[in-house]
C-alpha cells in the first residue's frame, strides 16, 4: 500500500487506494537502488510502456511475475498503476446521470467508506473517483450556495493559522468540502485578501476600546492561553496569576417575584477546542440567523458591566445590595490587579454570603481549570431572555448606581472630612437619581456655588451685531484703543488735534460769518426735491466761501443735525471753547475738490461727442426711429 501524499486535497482518509495517479508524471526523480527508496519516485515513461507490454503478455492475474521485470517496483504498485492509470478501460470523462444515481444507491447500501466495493459495480470507475464524486457533488450535506462573509472570515483566520491544510479547515465549515474550500481560496479569496485588503483587521491604534477589551477579556467566544490557578491566601483574598480575567458565573436559580426585571441568565463555562470556536458560533447561526446579533448584543452588555465593576473597590460583605433577592451569588475576580489586591468585587446573593474560590487549585471544576475555555450563553435561555435584554441592561445600571450611592453615603455622614493633599481620580459612575437632602448639598464641601443669573446680568452685555462690527473694525484697522469718556479729556484731545491740523495745513475758520443762514439753506435743500438741491449747489455760497469752511452752525443744537456727532468720542456737551471745536470740521484751502476746466481740442471734440461722419451716419437713423414713438410710462 502506497503512502498517502503529504499535501492531499481530499478529506476522507479511510480508503487504501490513494496512490499517485498522474498520466504524465515522468519528470520526477529517477529510481534508486535499494528497498529504502521503493515507491518514493514517480513512474517514468519507459516504466509505463514496459508495464503495458508485460500486462499484454502475462495478463492481470499474477502481479508478482510482472514486478520481477520492473526493478524498484512492487506487485502492489504495478497493480495500482495499471488499474488506476494505464488501464484503457478507465473512464476519465464527465459523470453521467446514471452513474451519479448508481453511486447514490451504492452509498446508501454500503456506506460512504467502502469505495473499493462500490467501484466494482461501476465499470470504468475506481474507488477514488467514486469517493471524490460523492464528497464533492452528490453528498446532500454539501452546500452549493454562494459563500457568505462569515465563511470567508473563518477560512481567512484558519488559513493564517493552518496554511494549506484544507482537510483541517473543512472541519470548521460543515457542508463545505476541502476541495471546494481550496478552489474558493485560490480562485477568489487570495486575490481579494492580498490585493484588495478583504477581511483585513484594522490596526491596533485605530481599534475602539470596546474591541480592545473584547480581545483581551475573551468573553463569549474567546479562549485563554493559560489556566487560572487560584488559591486563597491567609488573609482571605484570592491571588490569581493569569493573562486574562477569569469569570465564574453560576446559573440563576429561585428568582423571586420581587425582582423588578425577572431576567435569568444561564451562562456555562465549557471546554471547547480552540480551532472549533468558529464552528460552534456557526452552529448557533445556522439554527437562528438573528441569534448571532443577539449574542453580540449580550456580549457587549456583559463587557460594559464588567468594565464598570472593575473600576470600583471591593465593598463590605454586608451591604444594602445583598438584600435584593433573585440575584444568585456571583464571584468576579479581576486578575489584572497585582498580588494581594484581587478580591471579589461585589456580592449579589440572597443570604449575604460572599462566594469564595476553592483553596486547592486542583479542586476547581474541570471546566474552570481548562486552558481553552469560553463563555457560551445557553441556547434555550437566550431565546427566552433576549426580549428582556434592555430591561436587564437597566437593571445592571440600577445596581451599579446603587453600589456607588451606598458606598458614598457612609463617607458623606462625617462632620469634618479631611481633604487629601493630592487629588484622587474618580471612578466612572452610572448616572442615577440623586437622593441627597437639599440642606446636605448646600453644606457640602465639594459643592460648586451656583451662579445666579442676576449676578451675571449686573454688567452690560454687548449685542451680537456690535460684536460683529467691532471684530470687523479690528481686522481692518487694528485693535481698538480705549479713550477716556469725560468731557474735559475730550476737549483737550480735540484741542491737540485742531492745533496739529492748523499747523500743517493753515486752517482758517470762517464759519461765524455765514453760519446760521447757510445751515438753514442746507436743511431746506436736503428736504426739498432734487431740482432745488441742484440749484443750491450752483449758487454763490460755494464761491463766496471758496470751499474753505464746513457748513455747520455754531449755535445749532444737536437735535437739528442728529447724524453729525455719532462717534462715542465726539458725543460731548458743547463747551465754552466753541471756536476750537469748530476748527476740527473745516476743510483746508490747499485741497481743491475739482481742478480747473480745460477746453477740448478741435480733433478730440468731434470724436468724443459723436460728431464724426461715421457716428452721425449711424446715429441719424437711430434718432428718427426713436422719435417715431411717443413717450410712455415704464411699468416695472
UniProtKB/Swiss-Prot annotation:
Q: DNA-binding region spans which residues?
A: 63-86, 115-138, 166-189
Modified positions (Phosphothreonine) are: 530
- Database matches in Pfam families: Cmyb_C, LMSTEN, Myb_DNA-binding
Task: From the Swiss-Prot or TrEMBL record, state where the protein is found.
Answer: Nucleus
Any notes on this protein's domains? Comprised of 3 domains; an N-terminal DNA-binding domain, a centrally located transcriptional activation domain and a C-terminal domain involved in transcriptional repression.
Entry's Gene Ontology cellular component terms: cytosol; nucleoplasm; nucleus; RNA polymerase II transcription regulator complex
Q: How does it assemble?
A: Binds to HIPK1. Interacts with HIPK2, MAF, MYBBP1A and NLK.
According to UniProt, the name of this protein is: Transcriptional activator Myb
Keyword line:
Acetylation, Activator, DNA-binding, Isopeptide bond, Nucleus, Phosphoprotein, Proto-oncogene, Repeat, Transcription, Transcription regulation, Ubl conjugation
Q: Which GO terms describe its biological process?
A: B cell differentiation; calcium ion transport; cellular response to hydrogen peroxide; cellular response to interleukin-6; cellular response to leukemia inhibitory factor; cellular response to retinoic acid; embryonic digestive tract development; erythrocyte differentiation
Chain's role: Transcriptional activator; DNA-binding protein that specifically recognize the sequence 5'-YAAC[GT]G-3'. Plays an important role in the control of proliferation and differentiation of hematopoietic progenitor cells.
Where do we see the Glycyl lysine isopeptide (Lys-Gly) (interchain with G-Cter in SUMO2) cross-link in this protein? 476
Q: Which gene encodes it?
A: Myb
Q: Where is this region: Interaction with HIPK2 and NLK?
A: 90-193
Instruction: Give me the ranges of the annotated region Negative regulatory domain.
Output: 328-460
Which InterPro entries does this one have?
C-myb_C, Homeodomain-like_sf, Myb_dom, MYB_TF, SANT/Myb, Tscrpt_reg_Wos2-domain
Amino acid at each position: 500500500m502506497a503512502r498517502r501524499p503529504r499535501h492531499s486535497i481530499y478529506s476522507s482518509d479511510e480508503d487504501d487506494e490513494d496512490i499517485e495517479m498522474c498520466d504524465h508524471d515522468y519528470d520526477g526523480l529517477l529510481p534508486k537502488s535499494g528497498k529504502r527508496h521503493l515507491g518514493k519516485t514517480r513512474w517514468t515513461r519507459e516504466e509505463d510502456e514496459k508495464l503495458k507490454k508485460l500486462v499484454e503478455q502475462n495478463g492481470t492475474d499474477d502481479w508478482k511475475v510482472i514486478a520481477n521485470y520492473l526493478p524498484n517496483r512492487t506487485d502492489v504498485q504495478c497493480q495500482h498503476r495499471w488499474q488506476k492509470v494505464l488501464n484503457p478501460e478507465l473512464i476519465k470523462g464527465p459523470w453521467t446521470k446514471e452513474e451519479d444515481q448508481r453511486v447514490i444507491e451504492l452509498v446508501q447500501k454500503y456506506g460512504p467508506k467502502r469505495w473499493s466495493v462500490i467501484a466494482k459495480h461501476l465499470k470504468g470507475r475506481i474507488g477514488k473517483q467514486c469517493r471524490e464524486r460523492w464528497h464533492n457533488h452528490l453528498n446532500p450535506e454539501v452546500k452549493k450556495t454562494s459563500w457568505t462573509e462569515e465563511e470567508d472570515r473563518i477560512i481567512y483566520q484558519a488559513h493564517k493559522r493552518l496554511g494549506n491544510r484544507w482537510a483541517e479547515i473543512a472541519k470548521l465549515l460543515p457542508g463545505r468540502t476541502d476541495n471546494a474550500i481550496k478552489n474558493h481560496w485560490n480562485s477568489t479569496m487570495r486575490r481579494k485578501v492580498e490585493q484588495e485588503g478583504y477581511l483585513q483587521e484594522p490596526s491596533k491604534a485605530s481599534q475602539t476600546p470596546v474591541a480592545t477589551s473584547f480581545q483581551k477579556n475573551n468573553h463569549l467566544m474567546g479562549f485563554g492561553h493559560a489556566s487560572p490557578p487560584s488559591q486563597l491566601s491567609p488573609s482571605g483574598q484570592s491571588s490569581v496569576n493569569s493573562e486574562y480575567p477569569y469569570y465564574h458565573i453560576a446559573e440563576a436559580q429561585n428568582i423571586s417575584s420581587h425582582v423588578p426585571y425577572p431576567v435569568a441568565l444561564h451562562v456555562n463555562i465549557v471546554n471547547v477546542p480552540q480551532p472549533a470556536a468558529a464552528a460552534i458560533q456557526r452552529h448557533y447561526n445556522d439554527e437562528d440567523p438573528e441569534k448571532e446579533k443577539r449574542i453580540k448584543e449580550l456580549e457587549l452588555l456583559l463587557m460594559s458591566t464588567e468594565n464598570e465593576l472593575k473600576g470600583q473597590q471591593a465593598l463590605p460583605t454586608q451591604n444594602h445590595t445583598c438584600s435584593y433577592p433573585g440575584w444568585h451569588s456571583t464571584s468576579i475576580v479581576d486578575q489584572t490587579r497585582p498580588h494581594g489586591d484581587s478580591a471579589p468585587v461585589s456580592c449579589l446573593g440572597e443570604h449575604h454570603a460572599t462566594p469564595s474560590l476553592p483553596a486547592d487549585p486542583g479542586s476547581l471544576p474541570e471546566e474552570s481549570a481548562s486552558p481553552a475555555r469560553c463563555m457560551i450563553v445557553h441556547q434555550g435561555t437566550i431565546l427566552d431572555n433576549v426580549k428582556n435584554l434592555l430591561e436587564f441592561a437597566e437593571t445592571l445600571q440600577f445596581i451599579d448606581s446603587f453600589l456607588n450611592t451606598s458606598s458614598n453615603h457612609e463617607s458623606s455622614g462625617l462632620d469634618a472630612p479631611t481633604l487629601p493633599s493630592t487629588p484622587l481620580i474618580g471612578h466612572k459612575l452610572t448616572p442615577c437619581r440623586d437622593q441627597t437632602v437639599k440642606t446636605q448639598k448646600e453644606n457640602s464641601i465639594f459643592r460648586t456655588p451656583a451662579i445666579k443669573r442676576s449676578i451675571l446680568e449686573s454688567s452690560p452685555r454687548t449685542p451680537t451685531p456690535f460684536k460683529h462690527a467691532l471684530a470687523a473694525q479690528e481686522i481692518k484697522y487694528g485693535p481698538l484703543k480705549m479713550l477716556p469718556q469725560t468731557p474735559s479729556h475730550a476737549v483737550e484731545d480735540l484741542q491737540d488735534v485742531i492745533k496739529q491740523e492748523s499747523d500743517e495745513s493753515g486752517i482758517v475758520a470762517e464759519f461765524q460769518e455765514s453760519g446760521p443762514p447757510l445751515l438753514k439753506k442746507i436743511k431746506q435743500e436736503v428736504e426739498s426735491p432734487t431740482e432745488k438741491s441742484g440749484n443750491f449747489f450752483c449758487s454763490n455760497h460755494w464761491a463766496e466761501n471758496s470751499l474753505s469752511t464746513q457748513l455747520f452752525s455754531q449755535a445749532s443744537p444737536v437735535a437739528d443735525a442728529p447724524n453729525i456727532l455719532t462717534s462715542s468720542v465726539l458725543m460731548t456737551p458743547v463747551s465754552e471753547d466753541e471756536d476750537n471745536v469748530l476748527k476740527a470740521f473745516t476743510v483746508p484751502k490747499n485741497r481743491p475738490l475739482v481742478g480747473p476746466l480745460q477746453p477740448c481740442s478741435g480733433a478730440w471734440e468731434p470724436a468724443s461727442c459723436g460728431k464724426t461722419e461715421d457716428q452721425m451716419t449711424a446715429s441719424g437713423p437711430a434718432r428718427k426711429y426713436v422719435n417715431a414713438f411717443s413717450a410712455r410710462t415704464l411699468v416695472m
